[in-house]
Amino acid sequence: MGNMPKDFLWGGALAAHQFEGGWNQGGKGPSVVDVMTAGAHGVPRKITDTIEENEFYPNHEAIDFYHRYKEDIALFAEMGLKCLRTSIGWSRIFPKGDEAEPNEAGLQFYDDVFDELLKHGIEPVITLSHFEMPLHLAREYGGFRNRKVVDFFVNFAEACFTRYKDKVKYWMTFNEINNQMDVNNPLFLWTNSGVVVGENENAKEVMYQTAHHELVASALAVAKGKDINPEFQIGAMVSHVPIYPFSSNPEDVMLAEEEMRQRYFFPDVQVRGYYPSYALKEFEREGYNITFEDGDDEILRNGTVDYLGFSYYMSTTVKSDVKNDNTGDIVNGGLPNGVENPYITSSDWGWAIDPTGLRYTLNRFYDRYQIPLFIVENGFGAVDTLEEDGKVHDPERIQYLKSHIEALKKAVTYDGVDLIGYTPWGIIDIVSFTTGEMKKRYGMIYVDRDNEGNGSMKRYKKDSFEWYKNVIQTNGEEL
């Protein structure tokens, strides 16, 4: 195989709400995640009406990057990161979301963080909305089901683009915008969009109306960003779990093809600038009444993205003659026809380990869209043990990352995919999004904090730290 591009961005990925802490400091308002309690594997997180005294909210303090950012960025620099993907906490900039003017203390915090990154030669890659909508917009406006929230988001995007136009080049509008396709789990519509579905509402219809507003908001933000700095690279970001047919039975093959439309819907609109015909047919068939305003077509057309960012953790498989009752089961990918793939193994959390699926995904996306791609999440969640000598041995994580880097290298050097970079998820241990746990760790830096919020917060390098440092130094030559 040939060499990786010299300017390939090896990095790490995080989200403000999962690692910053300082949830009510510097003028920050509460976000939709600040009312989410701790859960566990198989125990869903609760969304409370207010901040309740007897509940534990793990994101409030998280790993306290808010006060430790210099120390943490120094560790990222020691690892040799070329970029750091993180997000700007929306409610840090607009505490309620509907203010006319941004919160200066919040803006200054990100100035300090970006300056510190750039001082160490680390390029910031920034997500505008990573499950951090101001709680006020969700409670008072109904989140993105309300068209007014489009304007609030664009106002927030403009404030960020203007303030950081000389510090940030790579942006993404919404993180994993397609998570909310899973309407069976209320966590996703709430965190993606600040939306709660009423008892008598059609969840899918609510989701598509909400999605339309977000797609319009994304397109308006892209156009606004290009006005502010034409050099900006503004991308979309989706969660991607490729779906394989269980067999060569044509029914299985066609079912996988149909199910993949759920995966492609959002990027189809954000990359191409118009609704795919299969989606319009679905609205018609199901009788969904989605309100499109005059001019929306033009907005979508004029706000297409420059690149596609995506998360990849696993693949899933479907079989046409199977019907699952438990669509919440991760093994079947939450799909009614999902089955276990006999050719691949799974992690302790039931996530299929499939590096070839990453190469497959890169090829499918690149064939479909012909724009640069960016792997902005990938990684291995596991329970790690801090030894008495301060070491953490994580050979499974190294093996997982190694096999996935081999797959992406092949996609670039053999298949010819245009790939901007690779940012493994949770480069330092953070609060898990789905469960609120600390126990499920992705990092190459261990943080001494447990599920109940106890611990010294001290940072320790895992074995994977030195391993990844060498991968970056050799531009992926030595795995």
UniProtKB/Swiss-Prot annotation:
GO biological process, one term: carbohydrate catabolic process
UniProt GO molecular function: 6-phospho-beta-glucosidase activity; beta-glucosidase activity
Keywords: Carbohydrate metabolism, Glycosidase, Hydrolase
Lineage of the species this protein comes from: Bacteria, Bacillati, Bacillota, Bacilli, Bacillales
Pfam families found in the cross-reference section: Glyco_hydro_1
Gene field: bglA
Active-site residues, as the UniProt record annotates them: 176, 377
PROSITE patterns the UniProt entry points to: GLYCOSYL_HYDROL_F1_1, GLYCOSYL_HYDROL_F1_2
Enzyme Commission code(s) on record: 3.2.1.86
SUPFAM superfamilies, per the entry: (Trans)glycosidases (SSF51445)
Up-regulation conditions: Up-regulated by the aryl-beta-D-glucoside salicin.
Stored PANTHER family: ARYL-PHOSPHO-BETA-D-GLUCOSIDASE BGLA, GLYCOSYL HYDROLASE
InterPro entries linked to this entry: Glyco_hydro_1, Glyco_hydro_1_AS, Glyco_hydro_1_N_CS, Glycoside_hydrolase_SF
Reactions listed under catalytic activity: 6-phospho-beta-D-glucosyl-(1->4)-D-glucose + H2O = D-glucose 6-phosphate + D-glucose
Function as written in the Swiss-Prot or TrEMBL entry: Catalyzes the hydrolysis of aryl-phospho-beta-D-glucosides such as 4-methylumbelliferyl-phospho-beta-D-glucopyranoside (MUG-P), phosphoarbutin and phosphosalicin. Plays a major role in the utilization of arbutin or salicin as the sole carbon source. BglA and BglH are the major proteins contributing to hydrolysis of MUG-P by extracts of late-exponential-phase or stationary-phase B.subtilis cells.
UniProt similarity note: Belongs to the glycosyl hydrolase 1 family.
One annotated Gene Ontology cellular component of this protein: cytosol
Protein name per Swiss-Prot or TrEMBL: Aryl-phospho-beta-D-glucosidase BglA
